[in-house]
Amino acid sequence: MSDTLPLLLRAARGEAVERPPVWMMRQAGRYMKIYRDLRDKYPSFRERSENPDLSYEISMQPFHAFKPDGVILFSDILTPLPGMGIDFDIIESKGPQIGDPIRSMDQVNALRPLNPSESMPFVGEVLGRLRESVGNEAAVLGFVGAPWTLAAYVVEGKSSKNYAVIKAMAFREPELLHKLLDHFAESIANYLRFQIDSGAQVVQMFDSWAGQLSPADYDTFAAPYQKKVVDLVKQTHPDTPFILYISGSAGVLERMATTGVDIISLDWTVDMGEALARLPEHIGVQGNVDPGLLFGTPDAIEARIDDCVRKARGRKHILNLGHGILPGTPEENGAAFFRSGKSVIDRIGAFA
């Protein structure tokens, strides 16, 4: 147990820490003027996320501004797709667009195994530079999309409100979908191993759209592939803390705990205390302040952080939002979130 390691890494491993570490999902992004200025200069999202100099600069922007306890790679969950033979783009205000949606077994059979060091060397370069730059002041986080969510994008071809296309595949051609999900699980595990070998100290898997599944369908189409990713990564990197996030996860919290992850990232629609009562004690939590609260006053932000941390006291907890910070959030309120999070123990007393 070494206090020379970053606070977030120590907390994620379950060590006793003086306060909960704090970072924000999407902490590098449109709410920051410095990011918007750079976006105006480089309007292509793929260029910003795949040019190592730009990705590194953007990843470091919130660290320079707020000194969070975690610095996460600026990238996208779809970044590994071209390495498997699936082209995509991200259109401003429209979101991801898949050039040729996956709808047939021939397309699935044609997918390539992912070799991250060949198809995404820029990711490894950025993670290594981040690790060197932040030292022990912050933990470096890597991330991926989970198989179900990646499949939802590549089958639908874009973001969806009701996921009718992939659900039709799930219920009419389940063998096709299972083969696609299995391919993604193998590839995503390889990608996470590459991220860890390159410098990521903690990793998070986003299954953003698994909350659209019934509990029974979560057990069939999401959880087994989440678990496969976790199992494969833990075979080679057993000491790297693994976080799982699902938007709208209140109905499947107990199921998430069976996937082998170390920490469950909660959205804001479940009470922190109630969530902890439903989860085994060895499972840590991350979250879960409503990102909409950051449109409020600094006092309101502080009060909600205090309530969240007070309810999580005595458990492994990483303070975060329950979703990514929203575009248009006042930048000074992002600063207030970090400031209040770092000073929470001064207001509520000891964390342990």
Curated annotation (Swiss-Prot):
The record marks D76 as: Transition state stabilizer. The keyword Cytoplasm applies. Pathway: Porphyrin-containing compound metabolism; protoporphyrin-IX biosynthesis; coproporphyrinogen-III from 5-aminolevulinate: step 4/4. Substrate binds at R26, Q27, A28, G29, R30, F45, D76, Y153, S208, H323. It catalyses: uroporphyrinogen III + 4 H(+) = coproporphyrinogen III + 4 CO2. One of its GO terms (cellular component) is cytoplasm. Keywords: Cytoplasm, Decarboxylase, Lyase, Porphyrin biosynthesis. It is found in: Cytoplasm. Its EC number is 4.1.1.37. Homodimer. Belongs to the uroporphyrinogen decarboxylase family. Catalyzes the decarboxylation of four acetate groups of uroporphyrinogen-III to yield coproporphyrinogen-III. This is Uroporphyrinogen decarboxylase. It comes from Parasynechococcus marenigrum (strain WH8102).
